[in-house]
Amino acid sequence: MTEQETYCGFIAIVGRPNVGKSTLLNKILGQKISITSRKAQTTRHRIVGIHTEGVYQAVYVDTPGLHIEEKRAINRLMNRAASSAIGDVDLIIFVVDGTHWNDDDEMVLNKLRRAKAPVVLAINKVDNIKNKDELLPFITDVSQKLEFKEIIPISAQRGNNIHNLEKIVRTSLRKGVHHFPEDYVTDRSQRFMASEIIREKLMRFTGEELPYSVTVEIEQFKLNDRGIYEINGLILVEREGQKKMVIGAKGQKLKTIGTEARQDMERLFDNKVHLELWVKVKSGWADDERALRSLGYIDE
C-alpha cells in the first residue's frame, strides 16, 4: 500500500496589539490555548498551536502584539519575540482590525516588507462594521501597501470565513513529515498553560485597575496520590497598591480569580485541580532582564 504524501508548515500570526490574533488561533484549533482579553498585549510569549487535518499539519505561532512603545524591558522583549517569529516561517497571517488602521499597523507592515514568506492579510472584526460598503474602500487602500498573497475579511470571534483562511494556509504547506503527533494542539507544557490561565483571569477581573506589571509564576505543579493536580501559583505585582487590588475586599477578588482559573484548568487538563494562589510585591520586575529571564520571558 502506497503511503499518502503529507504536508507541514509553519505559520506566524502577527499584528498590532488587540486585533484578535489569539482569538483567531483558538478558533482555528477549536479550543483555547492562547489567552484573550479586551486589553492590549495579552499575549506575552510565542504560543505554538498545532492543527492537523488528514495529511495537512499547520503549526501556528501566535505572537505578542507589535507596538511602537518600547520604554520597558518587557515591551522590548515582546516586540523582539514577535519580530523573530516572522523570520523562518512558510506563511505570515497579518491580522488587522477592519474598523480602523493606525500607526502600529503601519509599523508591523514595515517589518513585513523584509519578510521572505508570503503574507496573507486577514481583515478581522468585519462583523463590527455595520455598513459593509465601508469595507471595500478599506480593502482597496490597504491592498496598495504591500503585495499580499491573499486578502480575506474574517470574524475570528464568530468564525466567519475561517474555513477559507485555512484553505489558503494549506496551499503554503510543504511536502514533508508532520512535526507533531496528530492529537497535539500545542507544544506548551501544562505548567505554562496554568500560568497563562491565571493571568487571563487576573486581567478579566481587575478590569482597567491593574496595568500590565503583573505576572504569574507556578511554584508547584504535581499530581497527588488521589489523582488531583496540586497547583500553587505566585502572582507578582510591582506595588503594594496593586497587591490590594488583586486580593480585593476580604480576599473576594483573589478567590474569584482562583475559582475561575481552576475551572478552566479542569476543562483543559480534563482532571480535578486544587489551586492555591498567593500575591507578592516584586518591584521593577518588568524592567529587570534577569527577573524576566527567570520568569521565562527570555529564552536561554
From Swiss-Prot:
Residue ranges for the region (G5) are 154-156
Q: From the UniProt entry, list the residue stretches annotated as the region G2.
A: 41-45
Q: Which CDD domains match?
A: Era, KH-II_Era
Q: Which residues form the Era-type G domain?
A: 7-182
Xref: InterPro entries: G_ERA_dom, GTP-bd, GTPase_Era-like, KH_dom-like_a/b, KH_dom_type_2, KH_sf_prok-type, P-loop_NTPase, Small_GTP-bd
Q: How does it sit in the membrane?
A: Peripheral membrane protein
**Where, if anywhere, are coiled coils annotated?**
none
G1: annotated segments: 15-22
Enumerate the UniProt keywords alphabetically: Cell inner membrane, Cell membrane, Cytoplasm, GTP-binding, Membrane, Nucleotide-binding, Ribosome biogenesis, RNA-binding, rRNA-binding
Q: Name a biological process GO annotation.
A: ribosomal small subunit assembly
Q: State the residue spans of region: G3.
A: 62-65
Q: Please list the residue ranges annotated as the KH type-2 domain.
A: 206-283
Asked if the Swiss-Prot or TrEMBL record annotates the protein with the keyword Membrane, the reply is yes
Where does the UniProt annotation place the signal sequence?
A: none
Subcellular location per UniProt equals:
Cytoplasm; Cell inner membrane
Positions of the UniProt region annotated as G4: 124-127
- A GO cellular component annotation in the UniProt record: plasma membrane
> Which PROSITE patterns does this one have?
G_ERA, KH_TYPE_2
State a single Gene Ontology molecular function: small ribosomal subunit rRNA binding
State the oligomer form and interacting partners.
Answer: Monomer.
Family, as annotated: Belongs to the TRAFAC class TrmE-Era-EngA-EngB-Septin-like GTPase superfamily. Era GTPase family.
- Protein role: An essential GTPase that binds both GDP and GTP, with rapid nucleotide exchange. Plays a role in 16S rRNA processing and 30S ribosomal subunit biogenesis and possibly also in cell cycle regulation and energy metabolism.
The molecule here is called GTPase Era
Q: What is the native source organism of this protein?
A: Histophilus somni (strain 129Pt)
